[in-house]
């Protein structure tokens, strides 16, 4: 039987981005990809990202995160999920004991989180990575503000010349001149996610700059598909826009699930502020993992 059988979890969301928070700090178990897929397949625990807490390794940190996508793959960063973890570690009656600030370890590095209100948190996502080999890309591009990539006819592409950024996970941001909702991202997204230019696959965003301090964004999330919100994609969109001088270094990013405020500081760190919501708590039924043994 899986050690996750009958284990407690929290179903949350950050702007509609479906998050499950699982506390394994009292366990040595590491979630297997097939277990993550089984959790995602159950309507009660469906997620875009599964945020798993482990005991910290680095002194002075509060927990170590492993982040799973719906397809069982792992991700280096999830801003919306990190805010949900911060809420749980502060306010949940079982998990909650953190203060106004906490520091989490992730594959992307240390994430500092600050409480803004009972439901809103600011996450320091760290500096963006902009070199082609840091993103990574499969071939050199000296200027990643716009790279040679398009989809559609050569003389009339549907999308072209994205900016590429890593926020601990790879992002390609295509700037468009009309509402991103008018594009068939459900069809285009998986083609671009798996493009040979992205050896680790990529998150694909369509960004419409509507003002110097506002971006409208839609995201195809690597390993998860269409999502109502993606915090790291919002960070990448602001960085990509600011590098092209399409916006300033602070903007409100509007996603289908709501707004995030993104600021790219003079210290090169990108900070994201947004809400969290607890939907319910539950326990995994043992039968859920029957096929994941």
Swiss-Prot record:
One of its GO terms (cellular component) is cytosol. Signal peptide: none annotated. Its EC number is 5.1.1.7. The record marks 171, 221 as: Could be important to modulate the pK values of the two catalytic cysteine residues. One of its GO terms (biological process) is lysine biosynthetic process via diaminopimelate. Homodimer. The gene is dapF. InterPro entries: DAP_epimerase_AS, DAP_epimerase_DapF. It catalyses: (2S,6S)-2,6-diaminopimelate = meso-2,6-diaminopimelate. Catalyzes the stereoinversion of LL-2,6-diaminopimelate (L,L-DAP) to meso-diaminopimelate (meso-DAP), a precursor of L-lysine and an essential component of the bacterial peptidoglycan. It comes from Methylobacterium sp. (strain 4-46). This is Diaminopimelate epimerase. Pathway: Amino-acid biosynthesis; L-lysine biosynthesis via DAP pathway; DL-2,6-diaminopimelate from LL-2,6-diaminopimelate: step 1/1. The active site is at residues 78, 230. The lineage of its organism: Bacteria, Pseudomonadati, Pseudomonadota, Alphaproteobacteria, Hyphomicrobiales.
